[in-house]
Amino acid sequence: MGNNQGKTLKIGSYHLNFVKQIAEGGFSYVFLVKDSNTSKHYALKRILIRDEDELKGVKHEISIMKRLTKHKNIVKILDYHKVSDKNNTEMFILMEYCSGGHLVEIMQKRLSSGSKFTDQEILKIFQDICESVAYMHSQQPLIIHRDLKVENVLLDEESGIYKLCDFGSATEEITRMKNKTEMQNAEDDISRHTTLQYRAPEIVDFYRSPVINEKIDIWALGCLLYKLLFYVTPFEDSGSLGILNSNYTIPPNHTHSNDLISLIKIMLNPDPINRPNIFEITNQLNLLRNQQPLFPSHKSNILLSYNENNNINNNNNNINNNNNNNIVNGKNIPKPLPKVVSQTTPTPTPPPPAPSQSPSPSPSPTVVNNIENNSNGLEHSNSNGNISQPSPTPPKRRATPGTTPSLQPVSFPPNNSNNSFDDPFRDSPRTNLSNNPFNVNSNDNSNSSNNNNNNNNNNNNNNNNNGNNITNEEILNIITQLTNNDQTNTFDSGLLLKLKSMKPGKGTMHIIVKRPLKEPLVCFKSLLLVHALLSEGNNIQFKSDVHDSKDLFNNLYLGWSKQKDRYLQLGELLSHYSLLLYKFILFHQKNYMIDGSFAFEEMKWGIPESLDSNNHPISINTIKALFDIMDHLFLVQNNLSDYCINNICSSNSSGSGNVPISLLQHCVNILNSSSYSIFCFISGSIDVLSKQFSDVDMKLISCVNQFQSMYTRLREQYTKLAQVPCFSDIFFPTLPNTAPTFTIVRSNSFNRLNSSLSDLNLNNNNNNNNNSNNSNNSNNSNSGNLSGNASLNSSFDNINSSNPFSTEPTFNPFSATTTNTSESGFGNFGLSEPTSNPSPRYQQSNNNNNNNNNNNGTPISLTPGSLSPVIGAKKPPLPPNIHHLQQQQHPQQQQQQQQQQQQQQQQQQQQQQQQQQQHPQQQGLRFPHSASLEDARLYTLILTPSSSPPLSPSTGPTTAAQQQQQQQQSQHTFDNFNINGHAPPVPQSTQPSFQPHVSFAPNVNINNNNNSHVSAPHSLNSSSSSISSISNPNLGGIAQKGSGNSLMPPPLYKPAARGHRRSQSSNGDEVRRRNLLQQQLEQNRDFLNHNRLLNKQSRMNNPNNLFDEGDSGFGDGEEEDEGLLN
């Protein structure tokens, strides 16, 4: 945008001259401008607006700034101006100019010079920021900034005041989530308007709190203060997991004040209720700077009460615990304030009571967070790598009314994944379950007493143990009820929801392992419970726990495989279901960033660096792993349907394995949810990869083809299960009518791509032939006939499909078979390389040996030439290299077609020569070149002595039909038009002596009920353009592109925008469509009769008429006419 230098702009009373560009964003730029009247400098923000939503957001930002412009610590807005034209809309916002620049730039300069901020400087900067936030929170309604960070703070060098800027993320709404839809909307909004490193736990895991309020700004201020002190954010390395567990490191040997460290820990409280408000923080900063509290009605010294609570905690500890090794071995991490020795910088105000320097204080039962645990434990963790620090995600408040389980002095496995600040699944080797698997005290208090290193702390935590024992007993009771052997007591959804709300973590699998899993009903319920918990969001602790017990599911798979002879279908179902969960566990262990519900969080993950990135959720490797899971999920669904059909539906009982129907229905619901979520995840991944990487990789094309096949199988599985009487009342996910398509741009490596595509196309054709031959022999051949050419074509579709449900079929389900044409009765007209796509309905009809009956009761075989044409389907041509590859696959057919073309050309030449000899004076009476396609069609129907056209494309030579399709695609003017292009050559004895000039009647508008189809351009009469008959199936096709009522052959090209919805239609749809066409033909009778009468009158009034009734195309005889109209 440097070309704006020297330009001028008038906004209100300001005459601005562009000086230079000082900042740049995604769709915005900030310029330094100078007012020519006052010579003052201002900042001008230029925002490019792409749609109405962005315009609404910019207007909202301007309204927020206008409300806040009076405060000294907020950048003032002076004026704004909107500029719009036909192509672009821009908004200019004029603001005051802060010459000191951004705070982050100042920090970088200070860091490079080696002179970091002192504590007094940090207090000044942080106080200015907090006062601006306090002003926002004091508004009615209050304003939440939501994007507080050092990058959004500016310095005014003249006044030395730091000012807050960038209010594009600000909101006036407090979000209250009541259901999953509102939760998903809130998550999308947060991902667009916040920065991950500054997000609070409640906006990382939305299940923590149903309310999102101004306390997220307090957490962001804690992260900002941390960065002012240590020049990094507290969760720079640990990411989302560190935020959820409040795991951050206080660097050892720091030189900052203990008050600043305590202030960080107060603001980084994982419980938003226990965080102070902005007014209390501002008052505390005033005290630290020897100033009067700015908000007297609020607390003025939150550090004092905070330190007093910690002193009480320290006094309640046993003085005998003065050995750090005992504490480390007992896994009881103390939680005092960080030790501040001689390095501590004195504050201007009298310091609060110093915390006890005892190395072994125990946690207080009144503290409801683990922040202190993090700070102190982190100091030790840098010096001693053997310390294991538990930091599980705090459960929901309603599930744990007492204290947080993370404060309990219990024993933890030495390799507990939550002890480190890295991702919990990074260390693959796991140990077996310990005797006390929970991260809280178990129901039996003797288990905790077995931990010899914690004996000194048991007496100080009895209150906490009692509250946690209640929670553990409740979890144990719920799991026992859900996995009992009572056939009447089915899977209670209420108990399951209650268990999910408790966020079960370590130790859950310890309870499930002790269940009698050799009983089929207990095992089935246990597998359902694990699957339900595994699919619930991103419960890191449970994923770690279930991964520790992954061998259980492998053993169940092997064990139930051996019991197939005894339990038949039930044993097979349990075996495959166990293996499916085993695959799920391994997948989540490797792809820990993907939650159990397979939510596609592109904004959170970012764009991958390569197609097969190992550490990114969006990659070819992840897609292939999900394909493997889906294959096994299909197998489990087949087992379910077979079991229900053979055991329950046939005997109206509970089956040989005594599995209740309600339990099977619950299993179907879980499998449906998982399969549909994986389908959407794969669709989104392929769409991102196809847009991000322009170079076509065969791995991506292979994934596209697998996805097409998976879509077909998934659709068939849903249909199959829905037909089972036991599952007839279950809701099944709604899939798009056709598989999503993706845009893949070919790069310069064209030769490599062509060779790869040739192999791929041959493989697809072979797969189609094998599937069609074996469809009656196998019930699992679900990859089907729709996955071959359709998937290959979709790989090069020009349709942008960011939404997996925004597109329609990428192929024409009723197109004709493959032919190669060069010239036909239409002359050199249209494209020279039509594409081909075999109709999936035709393949299905051949596989199932289905026949349709015509009006006379005669069975009509659905051959490629006799299929009904597509109505309204538009299909663009395939790339030239695809045509070339397809032409090479059928050399024999190509030779036959060439011979047919030569014969037709010879016949046409003979006809033209005879006409020239008989009527040389009438050679100029052919159809005018400027006429439209529709006029030419009607001209052909009226003047051509041909048999009546059928409802379906011709079963004879298809070259004429394809040439006619080329005409409609190219929309050229007529060149050497042959009126006999539709039909086989007419014998010489029946040919007319010459073709007279005919004047057409005005357009006749006939009511057409088929309003869903778009009429073709240059159409005379869309309702009069379709004439159907079944009596003569030897003529060409009658479906014109873009119109359901025309006499052109079916389109052979892929749709450019939206395709056809009839790929899944039945024979009943075909009959209804034919009846509709027949009705339209009857309506056209008057139009054709009218034109025939005009022809007769013109011949009677013309004394030089050279026609006789015997040679006329439409004489007095009505046989041909009746055949044409009926």
Curated annotation (Swiss-Prot):
GO molecular function annotations of the record: ATP binding; phospholipid binding; protein serine kinase activity; protein serine/threonine kinase activity
Catalytic residues, chain numbering: 147 (proton acceptor)
Region (Disordered), start-end ranges: 314-469, 760-901, 944-1072, 1095-1126
Biased composition annotated in UniProt, kind: Low complexity: 314-333, 413-422, 432-469, 760-795, 846-856, 886-901, 953-971, 1003-1035
GO cellular component, one term: cytoplasm
Name by which UniProt lists this protein: Probable serine/threonine-protein kinase DDB_G0280111
Source organism of the structure: Dictyostelium discoideum
Bias type Polar residues, positions: 367-390, 796-825, 833-845, 857-866, 1095-1105
Signal peptide: none
Family per similarity comment: Belongs to the protein kinase superfamily. Ser/Thr protein kinase family.
Compositional bias per record (Acidic residues), positions renumbered to this chain: 1108-1126
Pro residues: bias regions: 347-364
